[in-house]
């Protein structure tokens, strides 16, 4: 290899490194904007597609099935145990919630007939996809499975996710609509 080839390869290498560094800075900037603008929520868990979700309504009065929402669960014994098991993460001032708000899909609302057991959640006669319960978590600990057969009462919803291993109403049951913080739609998601 002659000196000219080596200089040319070194020049291309430096350009490549510069481009990669520029892209990394841009990605960090975009990520910072999404998380600090107050217009987006991010998800990097396995329970929903990873990425950014645009907030379309804060403190919604009404939610309908299949809408995506965030909620801050009440600080109950069950959610405290979920926190200890690391199913949910600690929140902070930014979140104004004792845990990081959870991102879920409305599976059933007030007035819907729901049957829930280890085989899944059936809403108005239709079995929800990925709603079968797991008897144990990834660490081999037993999961409390929600059982219900009746009409969802006013002010309550069933929250689910499109993933088999999601921590959702299969385990914690009905959620008070007052705990719902935002309606969101996918903005930039993957996986």
Language-model features, listed with the residues they occupy:
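Acidic/glycine-rich C-terminal interaction modules and beta/coil loop segments
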Residues: 131-184, 188-191
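Solvent-exposed loop/turn segments at secondary-structure junctions
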Residues: 77, 114, 121, 165-166
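Short, surface-exposed secondary-structure boundary micro-motifs
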Residues: 58, 74, 119, 162-163
